[in-house]
Regions:
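Amphipathic alpha-helical protein-interaction segments enriched in hydrophobic
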Residues: 211-216, 258-269, 299, 303
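Extracellular loop and loop/strand-boundary signature of outer-membrane beta-barrel proteins
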Residues: 184-187, 235
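Alpha-helical adaptor scaffolds
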Residues: 205-255
Length: 309
């Protein structure tokens, strides 16, 4: 994943099933594990994507792909518009990328997002990060995918400093990468402060960004879990009350989200331990009872169900 595009080749790759023109990364994505709960159940074809968009994107407040929303994004971030093909080309690619993402076809979502150019990097990066965190079983491949996403997002926020979801996916990728190289190692390398700073930028641009609040809640909880309550507060500014504050904010913004609830339950255990075991189990129960709207929500419902058995 990178920010130098051959538009024609990228567009052809998004419509083809293979061939020698595929990049090494695209070829590796063909071996990605499939979403384990069916590839059609969360496929929002035709107008279904638009009619369900508000529910699907309540957590990140991303605008539905259209000529108007694309124009507003580029007005706010002019560097995104350099050499951009017309909306008649880009908008369908973005719609299809998001369809693939919500359906759990994460490799296709990456390919189609990349084909749309820098404006497609949010969906591409999010698809790759979700795949790596939830489905990739090989540790070295998981770290490699997340490292690529971090590098892409670091470049994206330079092009689009006023795009809340560019900052959000950057924070998501940094957080997942930190988890997989070990939180302690990540803190030593300065990633902890960067995760917090990046997610705070997302919230500053979009105060109703529930997913960014989740990311910040996870950050505080994981630092506390790894270095202890006192060291976390003194050295990294991580606090138990911030865990609760961020997750309660996320739950108020996106009630009945299994993503919010499952991460809330896990973070409660990390930050508070056995003293809040009952609360964590109750929140896992809430997550398990949710009706998932897309592949990521289904993965988190299944996770919660496993915790309640």
């Amino acid at each position: 994943m990178h920010l130098t595009f051959d538009w024609g080749a990228a567009f052809r790759r998004s419509r083809q099933s293979g061939g020698p023109a595929e990049s090494d990364q695209a070829n590796r994505r063909r071996s990605w594990k499939r979403f384990p709960y069916g590839d059609r159940i969360y496929r929002y074809g035709g107008t279904a994507l638009k009619s369900n968009w508000a529910r699907l994107h309540r957590g990140d407040r991303e605008a539905y792909p259209s000529a108007e929303s694309l124009g507003a994004l580029i007005d706010a971030n002019p560097a995104l518009g350099a050499s951009l093909p017309p909306p008649t080309v880009v908008v369908p690619l973005l719609e299809d990328a998001w369809r693939a993402y919500h359906a759990g076809d994460f490799a296709d979502a990456v390919d189609r997002g990349l084909a749309a150019g820098p404006v497609g990097l949010v969906v591409s990066a999010r698809a790759a990060a979700v795949y790596a965190a939830h489905l990739e079983e090989d540790e070295s491949r998981r770290v490699e995918i997340l490292r690529d996403v971090v590098e892409s997002c670091a470049s994206l926020v330079k092009l689009a400093p006023k795009w809340a979801n560019a900052w959000y996916v950057y924070g998501l990728a940094l957080g997942r990468y930190s988890q997989n190289i070990s939180v302690v190692r990540a803190l030593a390398q300065g990633f902890g402060g960067r995760v917090r700073e990046v997610l705070q930028r997302a919230i500053a641009l979009e105060p109703a960004h529930a997913d960014a609040h989740v990311g910040l809640g996870v950050y505080h909880a994981e630092v506390i879990d790894k270095v202890g309550v006192m060291m976390a507060a003194l050295t990294y500014g991580a606090r138990r009350d911030a865990v609760t504050e961020h997750f309660e904010a996320a739950r108020a913004l996106h009630p009945q989200s299994p993503v919010v609830l499952a991460e809330y339950a896990r973070s409660t255990l990390l930050a508070f331990g056995v003293s809040e075991l009952g609360k964590a189990h109750r929140i896992f129960d809430e997550a398990a009872a949710c009706q998932p709207a897309d592949a990521l929500e289904r993965l988190d419902v299944e996770w919660a169900l496993g915790e309640t058995e």
